[in-house]
Amino acid sequence: MPIDQITLDILWSRLIATVNEQAAALIRTSFTAIVRDSGDLAAAVFDRRGRMVAQSVTGTPGHINPMATGMVHFLERFPIDTLKPGDVLITNDPWMTASQINDLTIATPVFKNGRAIALFANCCHALDIGGRGLAADSRSVYEEGLYLPLLKLVDAGKLVEPIFDIIRANVRTPEEVIGDIHSQIIANEVGAQQLLSFLDEFGLADIESLADEIIDRTEAAMRAAISAIPDGDYRSQMKIDGFDDKPITIECCVRVKGDDLEVDYAGSSGQVPLGVNVALNYTQGYTTYGIKCAISPEVPNNAGSFRPVRITAPEGSILNAVHPAAVGGRHLVGHFCPSTVMMALADALPEKVQAPGFDGIWNSQLEGELGGEGHKRFAYIWFSAGGTGAMHGKD
């Protein structure tokens, strides 16, 4: 049964408040500045089918959008009806979620009356993951650190201690890394508690009908925004610094046909034996972000906003690198996708797109030994970036 507009607005506001509280719990309990202060994270709620329904206002496109499209991998490995109350799942597989092994994604099912009704998930940057980490001169993902396939981190409420032991043994800052993992677990629990309270208050058994309504309306709004663009192929090219005096080229074609939009990166540079390659899910995440900023910034970001958009890049290219390519510095290339898309749409949407700015974020990481008893090590990461480009009427 369709939900009336007033009720939908109330339910939507409560859902957003729920995921915002989830993110706030992660930030307030985190052991690291990269989560607490930089907000290098994502938090969201998914329905039983793995569709993202709502995301927190705090987060980055490189975390939230790959996590949104990546939940299908969790449910393929652990079908929803095989999960138990108290289960928690984890992975840092770059080709499943955020395209970098420093980014840990943790998902938790929510149960009501013995049935899994939703999942809460979050993704944030681990202070250290062993190996060479963010170094752009890694030759393969094997050099970059500890690679965690999709695993059950907590089984029916009991910590799977061998996994925690493996993580501790492979990272330079185990207290902070393990501490943040517990923060991620707690954040999902906070979201689950708020969701169950919200469902009880409104007499709902699950979020399926609400999810359908939100996602369908979002898709319709996104399609309406695409339909306002004249049909055609819109092209752009971006050249950025590479290595050994070999620039990296991003070729982009935005193809609009009716209420469907395709972004094709055919012609872009091939993947390289260095850590600046980008997995396709990260390319999709930042491309979707660029599209939404240009044509529909007011439309919610959920599974519905992804449906009308198709993003492709040739396998083995810099924007669709294949395993075991090194991807630790994928942001050095992937962050240029939004500007490349907007450059392509400049003729069609001159008053909506933004000129390119300082797209390539600069991460600085310090590691060392504090000295004294135990030879405890430290690590610290900070971000540096420049200004953004101008827009029509906004220098």
Cite the ranges covered by each PLM segment.
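Glycine/proline-enriched, intrinsically flexible loops and inter-domain linkers
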Residues: 1-85, 90-395
